Structures are given as C-alpha cells and as structure tokens.
C-alpha cells in the first residue's frame, strides 16, 4: 500500500516534468541545457526576453543586455547620470543607468560619446568584461581566478575563435548564472 510520502514523491516528479506555467519563453525548451540558467537570470530580473514570449537563446548578446545583467547582479546601485551621456542611448532607455554604471566603473568602454548598445559581444569581450566586473565591482580573489578560468574555458569551447564569434544569449545566461555560484 503506497504511503502519503510515496504519493507526494510521485506528485513531485510529475510536477518536475511539467513546464513552468510562469516561464514565458516559448523558444526555451524545458529540457534544453540552458533552461535552468535562463530561468534563473529571468527570475532574478537580470535578463529579460527579446519579447514577452521569446528569449532568442541563439541570438547574439548585445552590449546593452550584458551591462543590464551585470548592473542587476551588482545590486542595481545608485548611479549619478548627470555627468555622462551617450549620443546613441537616450536617458529614457532602460539600459541607460546600467550603461552609465558600467562605463563609470571601467567594466565596458564607450568611445566618441557613443555606447553602441546594440553591438554584439564577442566571446573575448565577454570574458574580458567578466574579469573587469570581478576585479572592480565584485572583488573576491577566488572569484577573479575562477572568472579568468571561465574565460579560458569559453575560449576553448569556441576553439579560440573568440575575437569574431559572438556569444549567444543562452551561453551568456549560463556563464552569468554560474558566476553567481562561484
């Protein structure tokens, strides 16, 4: 005769197998290798979709999305936006505060008064940005060393084609979610 605990175990396994009704992205399969990372980044508010129902996991990560994720991971600190502006990023844009924060902290660069929010992030730039983030904002020697290791791992995974190849939104979600656990 099954026990209450046995019924609970079966019910839990059934619920685990069902897709999360509150997870909005139809293009992220619940059995994909990056589902947990994307769900984590979404639930924490670090990354959003490209629309209400699409995450676009295979699309390239943009500079605006990366700085928004890092800004959120840093706790969304207060930012003085009075002294910095960008010709290509309006102050009403949701990425503006994150861009000012990231440039002010030396995590990413802006040039000639432009932030280039839609520029694609290469694997190499992602690794360097994460090293800067680890060293300047979230300093912990162990984390910095692990971030350097993660960057090298990214280079290996991409067969050292890191200068031209863009990192995808799914790959970045995996690396950023993993970073939180270092």
Model features per residue range: what roles?
Residues 1-21:
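Histidine-centered active-site loop/cap adjacent to the catalytic His
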Residues 19-33, 48-67, 71-97, 104-170, ...:
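Feature responds to low-complexity, polar/acidic, surface-exposed segments characteristic
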């Amino acid at each position: 005769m099954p026990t209450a605990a046995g019924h609970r175990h079966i019910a839990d396994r059934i619920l685990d197998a069902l897709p999360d009704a509150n997870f909005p992205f139809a293009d992220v399969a619940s059995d994909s290798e990056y589902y947990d990372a994307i769900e984590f980044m979404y639930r924490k508010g670090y990354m959003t979709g490209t629309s209400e129902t699409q995450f676009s996991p295979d699309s390239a990560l943009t500079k605006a999305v990366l700085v928004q994720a890092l800004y959120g991971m840093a706790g969304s600190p207060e930012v003085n936006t009075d002294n910095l502006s960008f010709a290509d990023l309006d102050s009403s844009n949701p990425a503006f505060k994150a861009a000012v924060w990231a440039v002010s902290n030396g995590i990413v660069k802006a040039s000639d008064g432009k932030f280039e929010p839609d520029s694609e992030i290469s694997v190499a730039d992602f690794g360097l940005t994460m090293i800067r983030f680890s060293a300047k904002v979230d300093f912990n020697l162990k984390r910095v060393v692990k971030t350097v290791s993660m960057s090298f791992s990214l280079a290996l995974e991409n067969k050292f084609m890191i200068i031209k190849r863009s990192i995808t939104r799914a790959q970045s979600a995996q690396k950023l979610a993993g970073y939180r656990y270092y």
